[in-house]
A protein has these predicted regions:
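N-terminal, positively charged/glycine-rich alpha-helical extensions of SAM-dependent methyltransferases
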Residues: 2-18, 29-45, 68-91
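Conserved Class I S-adenosyl-L-methionine
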Residues: 259-330
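A short glycine-rich, Lys/Arg-flanked "PGG" loop and its adjoining helix->strand segment in the class I
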Residues: 195-210
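A short acidic, Gly/Pro-enriched loop at the edge of an enzyme's catalytic core
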Residues: 170-182
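Conserved catalytic/acceptor-binding region of the Class I
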Residues: 210-272, 285-296
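A short SAM/SAH-binding and catalytic strip from SAM-dependent methyltransferases
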Residues: 181-193
Length: 330
């Protein structure tokens, strides 16, 4: 971890239930606030998260019947897989040194799995293979799949035991009912079709198999979006599906939702360039439309707006909102 950044996983505090069924979480000394509205059926766990049969009403992203609310055309992500593959391939050699917050999130997701695994395990969006190797150490016959050949070349060179294959989650190159475990951490936010991705995961899972998925969702990078707005800069194209949209897609695929927990992980940076490099270095924002580069004046305006809005002295927070899904194929 570089000296310019520090990690702070932020877990929502004890929830407060309002009379209309809303649950409010206050985090990070009031500088960040998470608000989620739930259908008032009493299907709330003690920690404020939904039980498996709950219907989420997250800022209108799901209607009362559990179906997704309509999105306007300009809020639908435009994903270019070739662009994403190219960006991640370029980042392969430096990815492990930059992606410190990704490691924290993946370690949490791996900790959610049993200590020992049996059968075959798939790591979707395996990147440099570090987490595929962790699945292998848990006892699984591990396979990593990624769209970025540069990442796979790095993984094959470093790890000899897992198998690494190029492929997309939208068209997984495996037969039905192959894997007892499917794992993915910080990769599925780049998906353009959550429904198709969910169906592919369900297809390759064996009956009784489990998927443990950590997915960055809408609400991530809000500080950066706010600072860009205050600085009157064009918004970067970083639209992500909501946790509710993913939940609906998994339900439609036939997978059983066992648990979903959404956490804010906050990466602290000492300056704006460190923050922007961390976003670019891990391939974030590779969603299709090109953005004009920031000039020196833009960067100065952005830094000033960020410091004024962050409320954290001498540090710039960047929030990764991640939903940890546990799914089962019955």
């Amino acid at each position: 971890m570089s000296s310019s950044s520090a990690l702070q996983p932020v877990i929502p505090a004890k929830p407060l239930c309002t009379p209309d069924g809303k649950v409010s979480h206050d985090t990070s000394s009031g500088t960040l606030a998470i608000k989620r509205a739930f259908q008032a059926k009493g299907i709330l766990l003690a920690d404020g998260f939904l039980s498996a049969d709950g219907s989420l009403l997250a800022d209108g992203s799901l209607l009362a019947d559990g179906s997704p609310a309509a999105q306007s055309v300009d809020t639908v992500p435009v994903i270019n897989e070739k662009d994403i593959a190219h960006r991640f391939s370029k980042a392969a050699n430096q990815y492990n040194s930059i992606a410190s917050i990704q490691r924290v999130i993946a370690e949490q997701a791996l900790a959610n799995l049993p200590h020992r695994l049996q059968g075959q395990a798939l790591d979707i969006g395996c990147g440099t293979g570090i987490h595929t190797q962790a699945l292998y150490r848990k006892g699984a016959a591990a396979t990593g799949v990624d769209i970025a050949e540069g990442m796979l070349a790095f993984a094959r060179k470093k790890y000899s035991d897992p198998i690494f294959i190029q492929g997309s989650v939208l068209d997984l190159p495996f037969t039905e009912n192959t894997f007892s475990t499917v794992f993915s951490s910080m990769a599925l936010q780049w998906v353009s079709d959550t429904g198709l991705a969910a169906k592919q995961i369900a297809r390759v899972l064996k009956k009784g198999g489990v998927a443990e998925l950590a997915i960055m969702v809408a609400g991530s990078f809000d500080e950066l979006k706010t600072a860009r707005k205050v600085a009157q800069l064009a918004q970067a194209d970083m639209v992500m599906p909501t946790a509710a949209q993913w939940g609906y897609s998994f339900k439609q695929s036939g997978l059983s939702l066992q648990r979903v927990i959404t956490k804010d992980y906050v990466d602290m940076h000492s300056d704006i360039m460190s923050l922007l490099r961390s976003v670019k270095g891990v391939g974030a924002g590779a969603t299709g439309r090109k953005q004009p580069p920031l000039n020196r004046r833009d960067i100065k305006k952005l830094a000033m707006a960020y410091f004024n809005a962050s409320g954290v002295e001498s540090k710039l927070p960047l929030t990764y909102r991640v939903s940890h899904f546990r799914l089962e194929k019955r």
